[in-house]
């Protein structure tokens, strides 16, 4: 199957360069969006400010439902909102002909997953203390602690794999699907395909953000039974 045209290939035909080119492009787009939305802040939001505020309020609402606290939801809002913008932009840019989704590379998804993993564990240790935090890994029954502890460790480590490979696999699959559609019917068929891929881009962004909140909640929200 013939490879699709990429604008980055006009500069240098290299997989590594293509990835870095689109990753930098995503970073620039996110910075521009943030700058435009905060350039002239108004009491009654309009235009891009209104759109960004709606996005942030939606994330806070989601975080409040997951963490059970408006304070905690807002505390971790910058992290989740930034990840959301990066993931969404990375997903959507791959739908545009001539561009490739950085999230279709395991390099980006693994870095994001590792960042979330390290941060929620850091927050859990900072909030509860290292002994109390890892004591939760042993479960409520001390007799089963030697069995539960390694299981919990593996379970937490598997989150890196699930977060990174879920996003990578779905977006990579979307790219291959789009390539096939464009090869078979380049003028008519892509229209519904673009709508489907846009929905999938939004869905994968939502899943990544809500799982980030879920992992943070598990780390910092102390259960009474412990």
UniProtKB/Swiss-Prot annotation:
Entry-linked InterPro entries: ATP_syn_F0_a_bact/chloroplast, ATP_synth_F0_asu, ATP_synth_F0_asu_AS, F0_ATP_A_sf
Source organism, top-level taxon: Bacteria
Membrane topology: Multi-pass membrane protein
Gene3D superfamilies linked to this entry: ATP synthase, F0 complex, subunit A
Subcellular location field: Cell inner membrane
A Pfam family this chain is assigned to: ATP-synt_A
GO-annotated molecular function: proton-transporting ATP synthase activity, rotational mechanism
Keyword Protein biosynthesis tagged: no
HAMAP family per the UniProt record, alphabetical: ATP_synth_a_bact (MF_01393)
Purpose: Key component of the proton channel; it plays a direct role in the translocation of protons across the membrane.
Similarity-based family: Belongs to the ATPase A chain family.
Subunit note: F-type ATPases have 2 components, CF(1) - the catalytic core - and CF(0) - the membrane proton channel. CF(1) has five subunits: alpha(3), beta(3), gamma(1), delta(1), epsilon(1). CF(0) has three main subunits: a(1), b(2) and c(9-12). The alpha and beta chains form an alternating ring which encloses part of the gamma chain. CF(1) is attached to CF(0) by a central stalk formed by the gamma and epsilon chains, while a peripheral stalk is formed by the delta and b chains.
Protein name as annotated: ATP synthase subunit a
Lineage per the UniProt record: Bacteria, Pseudomonadati, Campylobacterota, Epsilonproteobacteria, Campylobacterales
GN (gene name): atpB
């Amino acid at each position: 199957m013939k490879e699709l045209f990429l604008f980055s290939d006009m500069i240098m035909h290299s997989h590594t360069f293509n990835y870095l080119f689109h990753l930098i492009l995503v970073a620039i787009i996110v910075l521009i969006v943030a700058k435009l939305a905060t350039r002239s802040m108004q009491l009654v939001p309009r235009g891009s400010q209104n759109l960004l505020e709606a996005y942030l309020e939606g994330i806070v609402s989601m975080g409040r439902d997951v963490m059970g606290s408006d304070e905690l939801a807002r505390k971790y809002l910058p992290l989740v909102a930034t990840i959301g913008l990066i993931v969404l932009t990375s997903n959507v840019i791959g739908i545009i002909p001539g561009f490739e989704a950085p999230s279709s590379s395991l390099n980006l998804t693994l870095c994001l997953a590792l960042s979330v993993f390290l941060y929620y564990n850091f927050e859990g240790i900072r909030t509860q203390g290292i002994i109390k935090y890892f004591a939760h890994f042993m479960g409520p029954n001390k007799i089963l602690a030697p069995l539960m502890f390694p299981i919990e460790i593996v379970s937490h480590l598997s989150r890196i794999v699930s977060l990174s490979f879920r996003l990578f696999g779905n977006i990579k699959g979307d790219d291959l699907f789009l390539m096939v559609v464009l090869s078979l019917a380049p003028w008519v068929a892509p229209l519904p395909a673009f709508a489907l891929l846009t929905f999938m881009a939004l869905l994968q962004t939502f899943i990544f953000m809500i799982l980030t909140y879920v992992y943070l909640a598990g780390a910092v929200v102390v259960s009474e039974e412990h």
